A protein has these predicted regions:
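Generic start-of-chain signal for non-secretory N-termini
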Residues: 1-26
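Membrane-interacting alpha-helical segments
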Residues: 15, 26, 33, 213, ...
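The substrate-binding groove and active-site-proximal loops of carbohydrate-active enzymes
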Residues: 119-123
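Membrane-penetrating hydrophobic segments
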Residues: 22-45
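Small-residue helix-packing and pore-constriction motifs in hydrophobic alpha-helices
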Residues: 8-11, 17, 44-100, 111-118, ...
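Arginine/glycine-rich "motif VI" loop of SF2 helicases in the C-terminal RecA-like domain
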Residues: 142
Length: 227
């Protein structure tokens, strides 16, 4: 009998070893699959725990930042004799309102308000408009909010000098506006001069901070700020 014939007879007559081997392999594959599923579950669980821990740390971090910003604001208000004409609670409420419509968290805005409060001639509604304008400017120019606050604060504090600094940032004042602003300052009507400057800032940058909150990144930032 040829080798081929012998193989045919052996395969046809005795498959018990082959079947045993297949069953064993099937069990091993099944056990391996179960192990993989368990491992995936463990990995997913680890990532879930890691995400929760990370989120908790982020919340605690933001809470600390806000507490420090509020402490700084309170100190400046006290030092300036509440020159801005707004209480700390009124400022925090406004910061919260801005958080609802922009990508700036209230802790960031409160910190910026502390800086703006150091400019004693910026008061009441002018103060609020100046903060909103700083957010718009920072958004358009892609700069830090505090840097924008410093620039606008200095310009509003000394309008006749600040015009030049604002021009460097792309704010265009007509000769008539410049003349009017300087005249108002000379007459002791600084707040009216400030309003003219804020109106021009609105023309240049107005609505940018709110618009930025409308895209996917802005919406995600707003959601994060809400926590």
């Amino acid at each position: 009998m040829s080798v081929i014939s012998k193989l045919k007879v052996w395969i046809g007559s005795d498959t018990s070893d082959l079947q045993k081997g297949l069953k064993k392999s099937k069990k091993e594959v099944s056990a391996f699959g179960t192990g993989i599923k368990k491992l995936k579950g463990m990995i997913a669980g680890a990532f879930a725990v890691s995400s929760i821990v990370s989120f908790a740390k982020e919340c605690l971090g933001l809470s600390k930042v806000q507490a420090e910003a509020e402490k700084k604001l309170g100190a400046v208000i006290k030092a300036t004799g509440a020159a801005a004409g707004l209480t700390a609670d009124e400022m925090k409420k406004y910061a919260s309102q801005l958080q609802d419509v922009t990508k700036y968290g209230d802790e960031v805005t409160i910190d910026a308000m502390a800086i703006m409060s150091t400019f004693k001639s910026i008061k009441g509604d002018v103060f609020k408009e100046a903060i909103a304008s700083a957010q718009d400017m920072a958004t358009v120019l892609n700069t830090d909010l505090n840097a924008a606050v410093m620039q606008i604060g200095k310009a509003l504090e000394s309008p006749e000098i600040g015009l030049t600094a604002l021009r460097r940032s792309g704010v265009s004042f007509s000769q008539e506006q410049v003349k009017q602003i300087k005249q108002l300052v000379a007459e002791g009507k600084k707040q009216e001069a400030q309003l003219i400057m804020l109106k021009e800032l609105q023309n240049e940058f107005g609505g940018a901070a709110k618009a930025a909150a409308g895209d996917a990144y802005g919406a995600a930032t707003q959601l994060s700020n809400a926590w």
